[in-house]
Amino acid sequence: MPELPEVEVVRRGLQDYIVGKTITAVRVHHPRAVRRHVAGPTDLTNRLLGTRINGIDRRGKYLWFLLDTDIALVVHLGMSGQMLLGTVPRVDHVRISALFDDGTVLNFTDQRTLGGWLLADLMTVDGSVLPVPVAHLARDPFDPRFDVEAVVKVLRCKHSELKRQLLDQQTVSGIGNIYADEALWRAEVHGARIAATLTRRQLAAVLDAAADVMRDSLAKGGTSFDSLYVNVNGESGYFDRSLDAYGREGEGCRRCGAVMHREKFMNRSSFYCPRCQPRPRR
């Protein structure tokens, strides 16, 4: 699933190409892509026609178009969603198409059809204007108002595994499995450690590492293991070549040389160094 850096790459691409343009046509090719818009495909297309894109915003893994009608078009990429400008490699994966007044075509493709679009009202939460479906999400590490100390305070009260808390989008948004493993490796903390047992300094180090690794990923266009994540021009990111933990089972730790381990975690996998990140004793 695209995580914060990948969604931010898409947001920046859309910001450059479609802000200031007006939607002149919309076609929903697959109703499942608008299943979260409870009023249905016809309502969504009718309300989008003639609207101007005033901006593109994001929180965590969600992005949204700010429209001139004081509502937002919320986009969730799911596991395989892509926002592509121009031609697409697989027309059978196109779920929604939008045409703009200058002839630009935006296609939402989604092989697994787990993502989608919906229109939503805006509300103000803690000084930020957010679409209602996004309002429950915590600030992410790229947010100018992200407060490390405030998140540390929350984590110090959590009697569950730290990695589980990093993936909880109501604690801190935008971090997924890949960047959680990378942050924990950089901070030399095992994800199975109980959050409340860690010091403030250790927790802050993990959060700082998460922000740093995601900035590094953003600079390289994000992480692409397959064709499911690409930018708006269909190009893959290349941060996967720089991963220190995720996917490196059996390889040497880049810090100490120990063999990297993998273990099951919440129907996923966690990757870590057994020497740098010793597993807590039960």
Curated annotation (Swiss-Prot):
UniProt remark on cofactor binding: Binds 1 zinc ion per subunit.
CC cofactor: Zn(2+)
Subunit structure of this chain's protein: Monomer.
GO MF terms held by the record: 8-oxo-7,8-dihydroguanine DNA N-glycosylase activity; class I DNA-(apurinic or apyrimidinic site) endonuclease activity; damaged DNA binding; zinc ion binding
Keyword Repeat: no
Protein name per UniProt: Formamidopyrimidine-DNA glycosylase
Superkingdom, taxonomy of origin: Bacteria
GO BP annotation list: base-excision repair
Catalyzed chemical reaction(s): Hydrolysis of DNA containing ring-opened 7-methylguanine residues, releasing 2,6-diamino-4-hydroxy-5-(N-methyl)formamidopyrimidine; 2'-deoxyribonucleotide-(2'-deoxyribose 5'-phosphate)-2'-deoxyribonucleotide-DNA = a 3'-end 2'-deoxyribonucleotide-(2,3-dehydro-2,3-deoxyribose 5'-phosphate)-DNA + a 5'-end 5'-phospho-2'-deoxyribonucleoside-DNA + H(+)
GN (gene name): mutM
Record organism: Mycobacterium leprae (strain TN)
Positions annotated as active site in the UniProt record: 2-3, 61, 268
PROSITE patterns referenced in this protein's UniProt entry, alphabetically: FPG_CAT (PS51068), ZF_FPG_1 (PS01242), ZF_FPG_2 (PS51066)
Functional note: Involved in base excision repair of DNA damaged by oxidation or by mutagenic agents. Acts as a DNA glycosylase that recognizes and removes damaged bases. Has a preference for oxidized purines, such as 7,8-dihydro-8-oxoguanine (8-oxoG). Has AP (apurinic/apyrimidinic) lyase activity and introduces nicks in the DNA strand. Cleaves the DNA backbone by beta-delta elimination to generate a single-strand break at the site of the removed base with both 3'- and 5'-phosphates.
Transmembrane segment boundaries: none
Keywords: DNA damage, DNA repair, DNA-binding, Glycosidase, Hydrolase, Lyase, Metal-binding, Multifunctional enzyme, Zinc, Zinc-finger
Protein family: Belongs to the FPG family.
EC number: 3.2.2.23, 4.2.99.18
Residues holding DNA: 93, 112, 158
Zinc finger (FPG-type): 244-278
Gene3D superfamilies the record matches: 1.10.8.50, MutM-like, N-terminal (3.20.190.10)
UniProt cross-references to InterPro entries, sorted A to Z: DNA_glyclase/AP_lyase_DNA-bd, DNA_glyclase_Znf_dom_DNA_BS, Formamido-pyr_DNA_Glyclase, FPG_cat, MutM-like_N-ter, Ribosomal_uS13-like_H2TH, Znf_DNA_glyclase/AP_lyase, Znf_FPG/IleRS
